[in-house]
C-alpha cells in the first residue's frame, strides 16, 4: 500500500455528468466523442482506447469543495460506466508513461513547488513533494495539455 491516497473524481460526479450531459457547477454542455487521444479517464485513471472508447469532455474545478479559488478546466471520463480508481492502489500504472506536472499545495491553494517529470519519474516526484512539511496535497496534471488528472493526499 502506498503512503498516499490517489483521489480520482467521485463516482457521483461522473454519474451526474453522464446523466445530465452538463459540467458540474457550470452547466456547460458535456461533449461526447470517440477517443482521439489517450486520456486518462478522471474516474478510473486508465488511458482511453483511441478510436474504440467513447468519452465525455466537460469542465471541472478540481478545487471545488476543497479550496475557495476556482481553477476550472477540461477533463474526460468514459461515456460508459467504469470503476473509480482505488485510493490505496498507488500511482495509476497507465499514467507512469506520461509526461506529468506534479504541483504541491499548502492549504489555501498556495503553490509551494512543482515538478515536471517524464515517463517513469512521477513516483519519485510524489515522494519528494510529500516529504516537504509545507505541502498538504498534490495535483497531477498532463504537462502537454495542462489538464488536471487527479489529487494526491497523504494516507
Labelled PLM ranges:
Residues 1-11:
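Polar/acidic, low-complexity leader/linker segments enriched in S/T/G and N/D
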Residues 9-91, 100:
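N-terminal, charged amphipathic alpha-helical interaction modules
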Residues 94-95:
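A contiguous, low-structure linker/loop signature
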Residues 101-137, 141, 154:
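Short, hydrophobic/π-rich interface segment
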Residues 143-147:
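Short Gly/Ser/Thr- and Asp/Glu-enriched loop/turn motifs at secondary-structure junctions
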Residues 148-155:
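C-terminal edge-of-domain segments
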Amino acid at each position: 500500500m502506498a503512503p498516499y491516497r490517489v483521489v480520482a473524481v467521485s463516482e457521483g460526479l461522473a454519474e451526474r455528468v453522464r446523466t445530465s450531459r452538463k459540467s458540474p457547477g457550470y452547466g456547460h454542455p458535456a461533449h461526447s466523442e470517440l477517443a482521439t487521444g489517450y486520456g486518462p479517464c478522471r474516474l478510473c485513471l486508465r488511458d482511453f482506447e483511441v478510436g474504440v472508447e467513447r468519452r465525455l469532455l466537460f469542465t471541472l474545478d478540481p478545487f471545488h469543495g476543497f479550496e475557495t479559488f476556482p481553477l476550472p478546466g477540461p477533463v474526460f471520463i468514459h461515456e460508459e460506466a467504469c470503476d473509480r480508481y482505488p485510493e490505496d492502489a498507488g500511482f495509476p500504472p497507465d499514467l507512469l508513461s506520461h509526461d506529468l506536472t506534479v504541483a504541491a499545495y499548502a492549504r489555501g491553494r498556495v503553490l509551494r513547488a512543482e515538478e515536471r517529470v517524464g515517463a517513469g519519474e512521477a513516483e519519485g516526484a510524489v515522494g519528494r513533494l510529500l516529504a516537504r512539511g509545507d505541502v498538504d496535497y498534490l495535483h497531477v496534471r498532463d504537462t502537454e495539455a495542462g489538464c488536471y488528472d487527479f489529487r494526491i493526499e497523504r494516507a
